UniProtKB/Swiss-Prot annotation:
Record's protein name: Kinetochore protein Nuf2
GO cellular component: cytosol; Ndc80 complex; nucleoplasm; outer kinetochore
Taxonomic classification: Eukaryota, Metazoa, Chordata, Craniata, Vertebrata
Region (Interaction with the N-terminus of NDC80) location: 1-385
Signal peptide segment: none
Modified residues (N-acetylmethionine): 1
PTM note: Can be phosphorylated by AURKA and AURKB.
Organism: Rattus norvegicus (Rat)
Record gene name: Nuf2
Amino acid sequence: METLSFPRYNIAEIVVHIRNKLLTGADGKNLSKSDFLPNPKPEVLYMIYMRALQLVYGVRLEHFYMMPVNIEVMYPHIMEGFLPVSNLFFHLDSFMPICRVNDFEIADILYPKANRTSRFLSGIINFIHFRETCLEKYEEFLLQNKSSVDKIQQLSNAHQEALMKLEKLNSVPVEEQEEFKQLKDDIQELQHLLNQDFRQKTTLLQERYTKMKSDFSEKTKHVNELKLSVVSLKEVQDSLKSKIVDSPEKLKNYKEKMKDTVQKLRSAREEVMEKYDIYRDSVDCLPSCQLEVQLYQKKSQDLADNREKLSSILKESLNLEGQIDSDSSELKKLKTEENSLIRLMTLKKERLATMQFKINKKQEDVKQYKRTMIEDCNKVQEKRDAVCEQVTAINQDIHKIKSGIQQLRDAEKREKLKSQEILVDLKSALEKYHEGIEKTTEECCTRIGGKTAELKRRMFKMPP
């Protein structure tokens, strides 16, 4: 029962919530912690439970003092003092499971305890909070639904108005019905005439199309025939050309012309060959002159290069002398720096040795600390294992207790069923007893009536 689905409040918080949610006026002001601690007051709990039932179910105060109608009671005056408690327990028995409390009993009303009552009241307060949030959401949903219903109503009204307008537009008034009929007849006649004209025109066009198609096919045939005739004529022309022979005079003139052209071509070829020989001789003379000129140019260029090299070597020698002087001064500086660095290195080595000694010492201290921590962790782990074993044992005990409680509840249910059966048997026995008493009373009455009648007869028969 410790893993519940609602928070457990302390007594101060319960008093504040009850003043704000359940009790109002003087009852809420008079409520205090002393009403719940050390022992809760039953009359205060009756008032709180009744107010919660009034808030949730709308149960009135007079309902708690009324006999239930669905139960037959032989002696109702005996139950008058116990009616409020029984009705309160009857309503709370159905209300507490809704608040996630499943172990509420009548002893919690008659002889309340502080821990159980605080749990019951915290469950009731949690349910009231949940109910208020649900009511707020439901009210928002109702407002949205109302606005949507109003919009739907407006849209339906607008739709109906539009339908009415459409009906008015579609419907023809009585005054214009005759004109509408005449116009309708005229339109039908015009449609009929137009259809006839369209059919006639379509038939004429189809006939023309068939004629054009036939003419086109004839023309294509004629064109194909002409093409065949042209091809045949070309073949005849080629055959005739091969058979034609030129005249001898034309052949002679043509040969003379060809000879003249050949002589002209030969003379032109000879001139070209002569010019080629002259050009080749001139080209052969050119390379020797060019070689001499190139040699002179190379020598002059080598002299210029040598001059430039000499000037550059002189400059380099001067630069090297300056560099040698600067390097000698730098060497002196470097020697002094080297001596200072050697001194620094010795100092740093000494410092490193001291630091290494300190580091080794710290490492040893850390190792020792780790060993102690591991030992402590092992001890804690052992304690944790022991606690886990205790927790498992406690959980097993709780499980056993829960199973025992369940068994007790089952036994209680069985005893309740047995008591109900006994009550039914007692009721039936009482009814039989009452029936026997009624029968005996009736028999006694009949006997007494008979005896009184006999006595009366005897009295009347006796002489005076």
